[in-house]
């Protein structure tokens, strides 16, 4: 396959998300991004090395992961969204009039200290403000067509999300998935192997697939279909589907054998959705089985199949059984392994940027 046909030099990351942490005193929050939520939560709570300086103060631990935004096509995309979420008052992804309105709302009752020509300081933000800002970002042109989904772990935060966002004028695309999967707040547990106090990571967060596990069955199916001796035809244009000259997509439905040229299926999906003015579709109907298919699902498999030689070797490598039955010890072992696997991907570039905390209801702000 020629270089011109390659969509990227590396496959789309297995997983990348932005997250919102809340401290145990429920007055401090932290927004970050990571390729592995379980490992990152352990870092913030001091169970493994790493984590932001701002979350390292013992008085604020344990931190709980209240929600995550998933589906980012690259680490740079996640970092872009992370910065915009942290700095909604300054990001250019939101129209200036909306930015100003949001900043004015947050500054109500507070003395303005910004002089003309000087960059506006980040206003203090409550949980409500952070959730409203998140809703704004998910609906703006820059991000609304990304394959993003929202998952909550804190039931009370999910309730606030529904309460505040239902009153907003902006709307989210219908295909975005918003779900609640409750997670326990991290609790201290004695680690007998090191005699240190570590925090258990909630099982629902540990169970998030972060290493292409959810693509394995799809890859196996695609290999069977594409390696078949029979001549394959595009499900859209009916012409031969030759992998040596074209990028070929395979339907992810297990019982369906339909393959299509990337350009043909893209045009079909865009036509179905009446979105010919855009470049990348969101979803569409398989020309074979007529199932509704997510475009991002097929592109992720294609990028892994064509550019993920090393990742595929790791994915199909036989796994050794874990010897330890101690959850705390297992957490530590997992953290070390994951740290080696994604150390270069886990971004901490925002650590030194201060994030204003929600003001205490007892003390008056100066």
UniProtKB/Swiss-Prot annotation:
Subcellular localization, as worded in the UniProt entry: Nucleus
Needed cofactors: a divalent metal cation
PROSITE patterns in the record: GIY_YIG
EC class (word): hydrolase
One Pfam short name: SLX1_C
Start-end of SLX1-type zinc fingers: 234-289
Biased composition (Acidic residues): 339-359
Chain ranges of the GIY-YIG domain: 14-95
Keyword Ion transport: no
Source taxon at top rank: Eukaryota
Keywords recorded for this protein, A-Z: DNA damage, DNA recombination, DNA repair, Endonuclease, Hydrolase, Metal-binding, Nuclease, Nucleus, Zinc, Zinc-finger
Basic residues bias (residue ranges): 109-123
Stretch list, region Disordered: 31-59, 102-124, 317-366
Cellular component GO terms, alphabetical: Slx1-Slx4 complex
Biological processes annotated in GO: double-strand break repair via homologous recombination
EC number(s) from the headed UniProt entry: 3.1.-.-
Family, as annotated: Belongs to the SLX1 family.
Purpose: Catalytic subunit of the SLX1-SLX4 structure-specific endonuclease that resolves DNA secondary structures generated during DNA repair and recombination. Has endonuclease activity towards branched DNA substrates, introducing single-strand cuts in duplex DNA close to junctions with ss-DNA.
Protein's name in the database: Structure-specific endonuclease subunit SLX1
Native species: Phaeosphaeria nodorum (strain SN15 / ATCC MYA-4574 / FGSC 10173)
């Amino acid at each position: 396959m020629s270089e011109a046909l390659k969509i990227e030099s590396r496959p789309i990351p297995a997983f990348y998300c932005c997250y919102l942490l809340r401290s145990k005193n429920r007055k401090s929050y932290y927004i970050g991004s990571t390729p592995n939520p379980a490992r990152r939560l352990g870092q913030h709570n001091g169970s493994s090395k790493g984590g932001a300086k701002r979350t390292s103060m013992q008085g604020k631990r344990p931190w709980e992961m209240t929600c995550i935004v998933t589906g980012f096509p690259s680490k740079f995309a996640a970092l872009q969204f992370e910065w915009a979420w942290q700095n909604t008052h300054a990001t250019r992804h939101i129209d200036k009039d909306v930015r100003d309105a949001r900043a004015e709302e947050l500054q109500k009752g507070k003395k303005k200290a910004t002089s003309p020509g000087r960059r506006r300081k980040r206003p203090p933000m409550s949980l409500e403000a952070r959730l409203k800002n998140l809703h704004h970002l998910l609906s703006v042109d820059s991000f609304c067509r990304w394959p993003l989904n929202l998952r909550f772990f804190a039931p009370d935060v999910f309730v606030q999300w529904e309460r505040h966002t239902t009153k907003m004028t902006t709307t989210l695309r219908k295909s975005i998935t918003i779900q609640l999967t409750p997670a326990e707040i991290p609790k201290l547990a004695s680690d007998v192997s090191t005699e240190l106090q570590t925090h258990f990571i909630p099982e629902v967060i540990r169970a998030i697939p972060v290493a292409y596990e959810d693509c394995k069955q799809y890859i196996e199916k695609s290999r069977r279909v594409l390696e078949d001796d029979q001549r394959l035809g595009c499900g859209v244009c009916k012409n031969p589907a030759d992998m040596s000259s074209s990028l070929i997509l395979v339907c992810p439905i297990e019982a369906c054998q339909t393959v299509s040229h990337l350009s043909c299926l893209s045009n079909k999906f865009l036509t179905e959705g009446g979105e010919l003015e855009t470049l990348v579709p969101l979803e569409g109907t398989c020309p074979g089985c007529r199932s509704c298919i997510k475009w991002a699902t097929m592109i992720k498999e294609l990028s892994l199949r064509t550019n993920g030689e090393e990742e595929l070797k790791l994915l199909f490598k036989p796994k050794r059984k874990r010897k330890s039955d101690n959850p705390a010890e297992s957490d530590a072992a997992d953290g070390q392994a994951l740290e080696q696997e994604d150390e270069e991907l886990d971004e901490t570039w925002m650590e030194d940027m201060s994030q204003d905390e929600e003001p205490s209801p007892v003390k008056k702000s100066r």
